[in-house]
Amino acid sequence: MKTSHYLKKASAVCMAAAMMTGCASGSSGTNGKTLTVGLNTGFNGIFSPLYYQTVYDDYVIEMVYQSMLSYDRDNQLQPELATEQPTISEDGSTLTFKLKKGVKFSDGSKLDADDVVLTFTAMADPSYTGRFSTYVDYLEGYKEYHEGDAKTLSGVEKIDDYTVAFHLATPRIDAISQVGTFP
């Protein structure tokens, strides 16, 4: 019974990841030219940000998916799907991101806080077999949710339709980067 519940949840996560393909703010940059990229090896073909394993697949992911923050040419974090840098609570235990409005998935549905919560909750799920559980294992409630003792991951909170808070159980110097740059 429990396995069936997790399989349903994993299927929902995979569908959400597939819907993230083409997530963009609506502007398009078509100039009619072709970009040719040379690689010394082939792709594995796993283009899900939750499950890819090679840098070559990541090259494709970086061109298709966006994150709340991204690095600019000077290696500084800049808002991408977020409207601004996250706010940090006085004690450093909560990071709050505000999402841009009007961002749509390739199917036309809007990106909102529920999508962010779903993505990070998926990485904490016991059935998750990808390699990014370290992106959430320092959030409040991770252990309880991962072990099936809680129904939700309390460390990821929807504040409103376009605001998400991440509550850290353990301090992490790289928390803004890890949370902010994950697609």
Task: Give the predicted meaning of each segment.
Residues 84-135:
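Aromatic- and charge-enriched surface segment that lines or borders ligand/interaction sites
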Residues 1-35, 76:
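Short, low-complexity disordered leader/linker segments with a strong preference
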Residues 59-63, 67, 72, 76, ...:
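Extracytoplasmic/secreted proteins, especially bacterial periplasmic and envelope-associated proteins
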Residues 32-34, 63, 80-82, 90-94, ...:
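Extracytoplasmic
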Residues 98, 133-183:
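Surface-exposed binding/hinge segments that line
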Residues 31-41, 94-97, 116-119, 164-166:
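Short, well-ordered beta-strand elements
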Residues 41-45, 75, 102-104, 123, ...:
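Solvent-exposed loop/turn segments at secondary-structure junctions
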Residues 38-90:
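N-terminal lobe/hinge region of extracytoplasmic solute-binding protein
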